[in-house]
Design a protein with these regions (language model features):
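Intrinsic disorder
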Residues: 3, 16-20
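Serine/threonine-rich, low-complexity intrinsically disordered segments
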Residues: 10, 23-24
Length: 174
C-alpha cells in the first residue's frame, strides 16, 4: 500500500493506492469436481469437503455474517433445512468472517448447518467467487454471493449466481 499526501489549504487529502495480488482462478462449471478445502467451522473444528463424499452438498458463499441479505439467505436455508436434508443435502456456508463471528451468527439465528471461516479467501479464490465488486462508485474485492450444488461424488451439478436470498431453497431444489 502506498500513501500519498497532498496538503491544500491546511486540509490533508489522503489517497490510498491499493493493489491486490490475486491469482485469477479457473472458472468452475457444471460437471467439474468441486475443489477440496480444509478450514475451521463455527466451533473451531476443521471441516474438509472430502469428508462429505457420499453425500450431496450445498456450498453457499456469502459476503458477511449478520448483514441483511446474508441473514435472509441463512434463515431461508434454516427454515427449509429439513426439506434440504430430506432431499439428501448437507449445507455449508462460507464467508471471510472468522470463527467467533460465525459462532455468534449461527447461535443468534439458530443455524443448524456448518459455517466455514475462509479468512484468507483461499476457498473463495478456488471457487472463483472472490471478485472485484463495485458500490457507490467504489471498487473493491469481495465475495460474489454464489451457491454450488454437488452430487455424492463431489461433482458440481448446479451453480446459482443470481441468488434470491429469501427464496434460495427453492432455487436449490428446483
Amino acid at each position: 500500500m502506498r500513501l500519498e499526501r497532498n496538503l491544500t489549504n491546511r486540509k490533508c487529502v489522503c489517497q490510498y493506492h491499493l493493489s491486490f495480488n490475486i491469482q485469477p482462478s479457473m472458472s468452475l462449471t457444471i460437471g467439474d469436481p468441486a475443489p477440496d478445502f480444509s478450514a475451521p467451522n463455527q466451533q473451531g473444528d476443521t471441516v474438509q469437503l472430502s469428508d462429505f463424499r457420499g453425500k450431496k452438498v450445498v456450498i453457499y458463499f456469502y459476503p458477511k455474517d449478520d448483514t441483511p441479505g446474508c441473514t435472509a439467505q441463512a434463515c431461508n436455508l434454516r427454515d427449509n433445512y429439513s426439506e434440504l436434508q430430506q432431499a439428501g443435502y448437507e449445507v455449508i456456508g462460507i464467508s471471510g468472517d472468522g470463527v467467533k463471528s460465525h459462532d455468534k451468527f449461527a447461535n443468534k439465528y439458530e443455524l443448524p448447518f456448518t459455517l466455514v471461516a475462509d479468512e484468507d479467501k483461499s476457498i473463495n479464490e478456488a471457487y472463483g467467487v472472490w471478485k472485484e465488486k463495485s458500490m457507490y462508485g467504489r471498487t473493491y474485492m469481495g465475495t460474489a454471493r454464489t451457491t454450488f450444488v454437488l452430487d455424492e461424488e463431489g461433482t458440481i451439478t448446479d451453480i446459482i449466481e443470481k441468488v434470491k436470498t429469501k427464496d434460495h431453497t427453492a432455487q436449490i431444489l428446483k
